[in-house]
């Protein structure tokens, strides 16, 4: 059915955000690099051109051939896209006298224009550009302006091509979602039929057809992605799904046992493997973050390969790959090195030569959670904070020892349980504790101490690309600090990380 939206990516940092806003309207969309336009466009109802870090005036500026699209499908050209049509089709683009970054207010000039229906007067929009459209392209009609940008929006007569200089996908554009809805539903005629329920039905049907009676092996992590992937596959192929949950000794306190029990209660065919001693041995003497990651990854492959060999006649390896991973692997900036490139590569473990099945590969993180809810997965599992693949190894700065893991598990448990008790857990996107490679002087009773320092970290975010530190109540921080110092032997100082991303990252390593 022709109801999909094609998003052409020109390298903008906001391209994935466009796709998420479209999906929020229950409309399916896919992202393609601007130079890899699908040959078959029969399934698409509309096209959106993204912004770009390039200037259309630059010699190496993206210049795609849109002849198979223009005049045949409705087009919404965002930022660079708007300048592209002007620059290459009879208009003029020059450096702005006043660079416009941030908030601006929109004045709609053209009355009764469907693109701006139900959008408030002086609506706030988000600008991010240093070039301006001085002259509109051939047959261009101005639709809106701001105080600094004369041609903030226009359309091209004789075709359903609309261009806007601002970013409707960014939250700061207060009516951006309405504008996208106007374009996609009222102008392009797409239908809002992309729902979690429909995705589940379609995916289960496709998995049954693709996998049939073959066996599938899946490594579970306890995270949202692998859990939802497992339940979807189980719904499609039942006991032919073999799940392996590896304890690397770097999980949170009691996590291995509690999550394994939850998986079994869900009816999954899962085997728990305690390989904690093997991982700690592989990490012995390592302090460099990348060396630690590599050691954990290699050990996991060895453990998983050993366990996968116990299952006879496995054909497929399932992965919890989600859409941002897929987009990155075919991005404008070139493919990243990912596990997906491992097919039939000599020298790799046998399980990595299996056929790949990725039931979530077209979903964003928030959609994975909605699908999980549709599948009836416990909200506690779905609402869990993101947790790094290497586990506590990258929250213990420096070398790893069993004693350091014990200390951090206790500290982390007190912090996370405190967030739950204070009804703060669901207001935080990610939280955790970090064991620092320093000791500090303290006083306990009449004795001088020289013990470990731990940092607490809590951030709010939408997707982890950017993050702000959470202003937790002082009373909560005070109580948590006191509890940690009194209960965890070996810790005498607690600090709270108030760094945002950027410039800092969420994890310390």
Curated annotation (Swiss-Prot):
Keywords: ATP-binding, Glutamine amidotransferase, GMP biosynthesis, Ligase, Nucleotide-binding, Purine biosynthesis. InterPro entries: Class_I_gatase-like, GATASE, GMP_synth_C, GMP_synth_GATase, GMP_synthase, GMPS_ATP_PPase_dom, NAD/GMP_synthase, Rossmann-like_a/b/a_fold. It is an enzyme of class 6 (ligase). It catalyses: XMP + L-glutamine + ATP + H2O = GMP + L-glutamate + AMP + diphosphate + 2 H(+). The keyword Signal does not apply. Residues 4-193 form the Glutamine amidotransferase type-1 domain. HAMAP family: GMP_synthase. This is GMP synthase [glutamine-hydrolyzing]. It comes from Christiangramia forsetii (strain DSM 17595 / CGMCC 1.15422 / KT0803).
């Amino acid at each position: 059915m022709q109801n999909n939206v094609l998003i052409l990516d020109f390298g903008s940092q906001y391209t994935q955000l466009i796709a998420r806003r479209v999906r929020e309207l229950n409309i399916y969309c896919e992202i393609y690099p601007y130079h890899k336009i699908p040959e078959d466009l029969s399934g698409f109802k509309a096209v959106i051109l993204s912004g770009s870090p390039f200037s259309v005036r630059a010699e190496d500026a993206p210049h795609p051939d849109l002849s198979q699209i223009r005049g045949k499908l409705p087009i919404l050209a965002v930022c660079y896209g708007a300048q592209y049509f002007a620059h290459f089709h009879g208009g003029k683009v020059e450096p702005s006298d006043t660079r416009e970054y941030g908030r601006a207010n929109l004045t709609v000039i053209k009355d009764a224009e469907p693109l701006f229906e139900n959008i408030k007067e002086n609506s706030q929009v988000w600008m991010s550009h240093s070039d301006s459209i001085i002259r509109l392209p051939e047959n261009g009609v101005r639709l809106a302006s701001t105080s600094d940008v004369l041609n903030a929006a226009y359309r091209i007569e004789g075709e359903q091509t609309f261009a806007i200089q601002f970013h409707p996908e960014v939250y700061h554009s207060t009516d951006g979602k309405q504008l996208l809805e106007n374009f996609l539903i009222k102008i392009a005629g797409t239908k809002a039929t992309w729902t979690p329920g429909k995705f589940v039905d379609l995916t289960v049907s496709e998995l049954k057809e693709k996998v049939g009676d073959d066996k599938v092996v899946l490594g579970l992590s306890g995270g949202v992605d692998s859990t939802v992937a497992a339940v979807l596959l189980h719904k499609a192929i039942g006991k032919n799904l073999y799940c392996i949950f590896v304890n690397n000794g770097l999980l949170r306190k009691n996590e291995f046992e509690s999550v394994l029990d939850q998986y079994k209660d869900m009816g999954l065919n899962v085997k728990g493997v305690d390989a904690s001693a093997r991982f700690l041995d592989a990490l012995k003497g390592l302090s460099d973050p990348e060396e630690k990651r590599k050691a954990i990854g290699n050990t996991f492959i060895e453990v998983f390969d050993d366990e996968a060999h116990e299952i006879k006649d496995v054909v497929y390896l399932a992965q919890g790959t989600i859409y941002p991973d897929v987009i990155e692997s075919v991005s404008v900036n070139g493919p990243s090195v990912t596990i997906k490139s491992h097919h039939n590569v000599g020298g790799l473990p046998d399980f990595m030569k299996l056929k790949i099945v990725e039931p979530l590969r077209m979903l964003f993180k928030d959609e994975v959670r909605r699908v999980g809810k549709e599948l009836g997965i416990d909200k506690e599992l779905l609402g869990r904070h993101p947790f790094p693949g290497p586990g506590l190894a990258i929250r213990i700065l420096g070398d790893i020892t069993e004693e350091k893991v014990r200390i951090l598990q206790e500290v982390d448990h007190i912090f996370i349980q405190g967030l739950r008790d204070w009804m703060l857990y669901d207001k935080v996107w990610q939280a955790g504790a970090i064991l620092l490679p320093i000791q500090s002087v303290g006083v306990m009773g009449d004795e001088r101490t020289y013990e470990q320092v731990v940092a607490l970290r809590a951030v709010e975010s939408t997707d982890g690309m950017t993050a702000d530190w959470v202003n937790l109540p002082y009373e909560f921080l005070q109580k948590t600090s006191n509890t940690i110092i009194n209960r965890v032997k070996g810790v005498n100082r607690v600090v709270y990380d108030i760094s945002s991303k950027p410039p800092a990252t969420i994890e310390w390593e």
